[in-house]
């Protein structure tokens, strides 16, 4: 496939361009420059309205995410027959669909993280400062707590009786199983985030930034399909924390550490893989 070319139709304009595919596309000069790494500390952000606006966007997005998804979980749990509700597939669609919609809405304001693990992975890749990363994580957790709290306010009895959407390792699985599921699931999500938002790809293909929320939401959907039977699917420490705090019963905290340690390990591995193996950033800096 090296060096082969194909005609590409560009939207409704019907213009054609000669675009190489295969390895030839990788070697073509696209006037791309590697963005500089974010500083570790950036005190100037604290005096910028855009900094606080981004945090508010993360709060609202995570609030809405917990509100819709926990309501969906409660609707499935309360049913006596699987055929009368959306089931596991519906829960997975609710989580994936909300991430798709919310990332689309907030990407231009905050980057659309909605997840401390995503924020942590991007911080390790030097995509944002420690100041911003910590602020995002706090706002995400507060939004998740408020979102779960509103659900409990709407249907307290049902919420209390059905576990409040809290993440726990299911019977028949060990804590190691749960931890492994969270690590791999978060790796898939964060690696998808890196790939979908890659600046080099965006420079090459102008449609990529618009479509970025789609693969991210789809990754969330697929991971939920696979791991709901194991842990209820965390892959988002804010989601797990919000549900656990509002439900606040003993078993909700028994395995809670898994839903922080697993996602953070998965995010770190995804950042390492993307930056070192896929993008080869350390090797570029030496050349």
Swiss-Prot record:
Gene Ontology cellular component list: plasma membrane
Region (Disordered), start-end ranges: 1-37
Topological domains annotated Extracellular: 77-89, 155-175, 231-257
Topology versus the membrane: Multi-pass membrane protein
Entry GO MF terms: water channel activity
InterPro entries: Aquaporin-like, Aquaporin_transptr, MIP, MIP_CS
CDD domains linked to this entry: MIP
Residue ranges annotated as motif NPA 2: 236-238
Tissue: Barely detectable in roots, leaves and fruits.
Role, per record: Water channel required to facilitate the transport of water across cell membrane; mercury-insensitive. Contributes to the tolerance to multiple abiotic stresses including salt (NaCl), cold and water deprivation, by modulating cytosolic K(+)/Na(+) ratio, maintaining osmotic balance, and reducing membrane injury (e.g. oxidative injury).
Name of this chain's protein: Aquaporin PIP1-2
The organism of origin for this protein: Musa acuminata subsp. malaccensis
Lineage: Eukaryota, Viridiplantae, Streptophyta, Embryophyta, Tracheophyta
Encoding gene per record: PIP1-2
């Amino acid at each position: 496939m090296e060096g082969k070319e194909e005609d590409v139709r560009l939207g409704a304009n019907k213009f054609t361009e000669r675009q190489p595919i295969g390895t030839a596309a990788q070697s073509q000069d696209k006037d791309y420059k590697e963005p500089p790494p974010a500083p570790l500390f950036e005190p100037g952000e604290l005096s910028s309205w855009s900094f606080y606006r981004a945090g508010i966007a993360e709060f609202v997005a995570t609030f809405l995410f917990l509100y819709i998804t926990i309501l969906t979980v409660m609707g499935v749990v309360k049913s006596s027959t699987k055929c009368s509700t959306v089931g596991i597939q519906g829960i997975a669609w609710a989580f994936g669909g909300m991430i798709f919609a919310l990332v689309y809405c907030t990407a231009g304001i905050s980057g659309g993280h909605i997840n401390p693990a995503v924020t942590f992975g991007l911080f390790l890749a030097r995509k944002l400062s420690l100041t911003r990363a910590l602020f995002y994580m706090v706002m995400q957790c507060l939004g998740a707590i408020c979102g779960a709290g509103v659900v409990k306010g709407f249907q307290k009895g049902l919420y209390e009786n059905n576990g409040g959407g809290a993440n726990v390792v299911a019977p028949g699985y060990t804590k190691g199983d749960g931890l492994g599921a969270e690590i791999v699931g978060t790796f898939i999500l964060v690696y998808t985030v890196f790939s979908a938002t890659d600046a080099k790809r965006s420079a090459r293909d102008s449609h990529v930034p618009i479509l970025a929320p789609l693969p991210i939401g789809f990754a969330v959907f697929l991971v939920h399909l696979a791991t709901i039977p194991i842990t209820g699917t965390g892959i988002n420490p804010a989601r797990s924390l919000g549900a656990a705090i509002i439900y606040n019963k003993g078993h909700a905290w028994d395995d809670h550490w898994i839903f922080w340690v697993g996602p953070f390990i998965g995010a770190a591995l995804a950042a390492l893989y993307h930056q070192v193996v896929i993008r080869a950033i350390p090797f570029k800096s030496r050349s």
